[in-house]
Amino acid sequence: MTNHRIDRVGMEIKREVNEILHKKVRDPRVQGVTITEVQMLGDLSVAKVYYTIMSDLASDNQKAEIGLKKATGTIKRELGKQLTMYKIPDLVFEKDNSIAYGNKIDQLLRELEKKQ
């Protein structure tokens, strides 16, 4: 299977999961969750879904993680309705720390600029 297909499937899953989270999942724990990236396994059996949440509070992050785990079945079922694939991949949710890392770098650069 070519990388183009894997990338396209990952992009489609990202788009659909974002839409499902905002329109179909009513759990308040996942209301601020945004999907940032989806990485597919080579055989399309597993999709690692990276997410971010607006809140920096550890309790909100933990609630979002629990909410996503509880909603995985619903999300997968809705993906099955939307995608034309033989088998819908298993979803593994993982927090994306790249945005927090980028914000920290921005803050450090601003502090450096103030010192000069």
UniProtKB/Swiss-Prot annotation:
Major place of localization?
cytoplasm
Originating species: Streptococcus equi subsp. zooepidemicus (strain MGCS10565)
* Cytoplasm as UniProt keyword: yes
UniProt-annotated location(s)? Cytoplasm
Question: Lineage from the top down?
Answer: Bacteria, Bacillati, Bacillota, Bacilli, Lactobacillales
Subunit text: Monomer. Binds 30S ribosomal subunits, but not 50S ribosomal subunits or 70S ribosomes.
Tell me the InterPro entries matching this sequence.
KH_dom-like_a/b (IPR015946), RbfA (IPR000238), RbfA_dom_sf (IPR023799), Ribosome-bd_factorA_CS (IPR020053)
> Which NCBIfam families does the UniProt record give?
rbfA
- What are the recorded GO MF terms, alphabetically? ribosomal small subunit binding
Q: Which UniProt keywords apply?
A: Cytoplasm, Ribosome biogenesis
User: What job does the chain carry out?
Assistant: One of several proteins that assist in the late maturation steps of the functional core of the 30S ribosomal subunit. Associates with free 30S ribosomal subunits (but not with 30S subunits that are part of 70S ribosomes or polysomes). Required for efficient processing of 16S rRNA. May interact with the 5'-terminal helix region of 16S rRNA.
| One GO CC term on file | cytosol
Gene for this protein?
rbfA
Recorded hits in Pfam families, A to Z, give: RBFA
Its name, as the record gives it, is Ribosome-binding factor A
Would I find Cell cycle among this entry's keywords? no
Biological process (GO) annotations held by this record are: maturation of SSU-rRNA
The family line of this record is: Belongs to the RbfA family.
